[in-house]
Amino acid sequence: MIKFSINKTAFQNALKITKQAIGSKVTIPALTKLKIEVEEKGITLIGSNGQISIKNFLPADNKDASMLISGTGSVLLEAAFFENVVSQLPEVTLEFIEKEQKQVLLTSGKSEITLKGLDSEIYPHLQEISEGSSLKMKVKVLKEIFTETVFAVSTQENRPIFTGVHLETLSTGELKAVATDSHRMSQRLLPLEDTDLKFDVILPSKSINSFKNVFTNDEEEIEIFISGSQMLFQNETISYYSRLIEGSYPDTNRLIPNEADYTLDLVFDAAQLRHTMDRARLLTVMTTNGTVKLTVSGDSVVTTANSPEVGSVHEELTALSKEGNDLSISFNPEYLIDALKVIKAPEVRIRFISNVRPFTLQPRNEESGFVQLITPVRTN
């Protein structure tokens, strides 16, 4: 039967990470539980919501954990309640003792709390991924790619393939990450080190958002495996599984204009442009079409927004450079603000074809393989 003592902070941190995969709205009641497996070599915490699964291993020789294991076994505990109980324990160290009929006694200082557990045999078997070809990447790089694309996914569940980020290895030795909700698109290309792993998958946005909270050390390297309908991200102690979205992602390369198609090329200070859009948005949220108009005439660049109920906004913008024809185009400022949020460069390049064709954004003077596309709104 299980018996161990452990540093409360180390255990609590592991609990917090594992609980990222445990949800209250699940079809299988056992998935609201935390599975605890104790072996002589260490403690494994397991959580899953059917879409995301996390195995978090605390090795017995972890110095921060100050772990002492004197009994092994496994048990299920109500995840949310157990985490709250552990957080309220008074001392630095907690002791975990399994009693008869899967009851668990937690002691810390003068505090004793008894919890009702369940047999771990009722917990669903989690599909494993056999370790074969893999791709190694720094957490920081992967987070950047996800941040630069995930905001553009669709929130409409009736088109599931657009609710995730499309990840594909190309014959050019690059990783392509792209997301679109059909109104905007964000695409990032990243050169890869030598890898035999080839894939063309759609990773759900919910998995991406949880990933950022699970792998907190940006400088560490993780290994990526793919098998069938699952993707595995793994470091020395954490295995993070995600189900993939079924279906074929459309070819988004055809959406990106050819260089010869552009008729207007503008460069702006990214921060100034974002502040201008923020001010315009204050008014556009009060209008039915929610659009701002950008008018380029000679050396003049002006943004305007009008609301019969509230008023109007008129602001002159300074273009750092301008090449091409005059243009007047309307669009949703929210999309441009979201796009600018993920561009780290101080200057942004925006290129247009016409007032009814999508326009593109890229960091200026940066061959990063990062391009975004926004569809304009037709107005009378």
UniProtKB/Swiss-Prot annotation:
The protein depicted here goes by the name Beta sliding clamp
- GO terms (BP aspect): DNA strand elongation involved in DNA replication
Where in or outside the cell it occurs: the entry states: Cytoplasm
Q: Please state the Enzyme Commission number of this protein.
A: 2.7.7.7
**What's this protein's function?**
Confers DNA tethering and processivity to DNA polymerases and other proteins. Acts as a clamp, forming a ring around DNA (a reaction catalyzed by the clamp-loading complex) which diffuses in an ATP-independent manner freely and bidirectionally along dsDNA. Initially characterized for its ability to contact the catalytic subunit of DNA polymerase III (Pol III), a complex, multichain enzyme responsible for most of the replicative synthesis in bacteria; Pol III exhibits 3'-5' exonuclease proofreading activity.
Per the record, the similarity remark reads: Belongs to the beta sliding clamp family.
Spell out the molecular function terms from Gene Ontology.
3'-5' exonuclease activity; DNA binding; DNA-directed DNA polymerase activity
UniProt keyword terms in alphabetical order:
Cytoplasm, DNA replication, DNA-binding, DNA-directed DNA polymerase, Nucleotidyltransferase, Transferase
Phylogenetic lineage? Bacteria, Bacillati, Bacillota, Bacilli, Lactobacillales
Which Pfam families would you find in this protein's record? DNA_pol3_beta, DNA_pol3_beta_2, DNA_pol3_beta_3
Write out the catalysed reaction. DNA(n) + a 2'-deoxyribonucleoside 5'-triphosphate = DNA(n+1) + diphosphate
Organism expressing this protein natively: Lactococcus lactis subsp. cremoris (strain MG1363)
Q: Which domain of life is it from?
A: Bacteria
